[in-house]
Amino acid sequence: MQDFKFMMITNNPVEASELVKAGVDRLFVDLELTGKELRQGHRDTVISHHSIQDVEALSAVKQSAELLVRINPFDENSKAEIDAVIEAGADIVMLPMFRDQAQIDEVVRIIDGRALFCPLIETLDACAWFCSDEANLMGVDELYFGLNDLHLELNLRFMFASLLDSRVASAIAHAKDIGMPFGFGGIAPVDAGQLDGGSVAALHLELGSQRVILSRMFRPLLSENSTVFVEEVSRLRSVIETLEGDAIATSQLARQSRQMIHAIESDH
């Protein structure tokens, strides 16, 4: 099985411990607030209010898991914020809404090898930058494609419809071609969601993705009964393992998934 990592957003140390026991590979602390309310506040999206103290608390309970921290978009406070999250225990720093190569270079310089660096590609400009000759990926360890903001920029109604846009698809294909580890979007339990977890898993495998965020549909399972949560995480991983061993089935399910995405977007 390829190095496929499950991530989940949390700032609760007790919950984080349960996530690690359930096989979640990365704990995700989300510090991003700058500009997010303006971009996403009118949509049914989660805007976290996490803190540096949350990074410290999760670092103490992460055990074998990695701790990913999404910081705010680059500005005059970025150096202090990056230094603080690394000192608090971040293993991976995720930069949202970057504007140009200069910001990437500056974050690489600030991190200085103390943590992994994951730029978040969530604009068409970022997609174009990544596919251009101007993109210098020295110091970039992996990428994540933020379908939420991409689908808003594309004026689409269904988040996964972003994957059908040629510019987004080209950027994802480029990541696969150059061997850059990447992930995109979120994933629901196997039989849940407008686009169920099994269908989303097939898209990830076909496109070469190796990371995914467990969606908020998993959270009630954890709150109600941790055993059910563990079972659903294990079930999703089993589906991924099965699909990895059957390229034909993966291709067929991914094709059906695209048809479902198109139908959902058209019906909105």
Regions found by a protein language model. Give the residues of each.
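Hydrophobic faces of well-ordered beta-strands that scaffold small-molecule active sites
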Residues: 4-10, 27-29, 67-71, 93-95, ...
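Acidic (Asp/Glu)-rich catalytic clusters
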Residues: 19-23, 52-64, 83-88, 108-113, ...
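Active-site-adjacent beta->alpha loops and helix N-cap segments on the catalytic face
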Residues: 35-58, 75-79, 97-116, 126-129, ...
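Glycine/small-residue-rich loop that forms an oxyanion/phosphate-binding "nest" at active or ligand-binding sites
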Residues: 64-95
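C-terminal alpha-helical cap/extension of soluble enzyme domains
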Residues: 78, 176-268
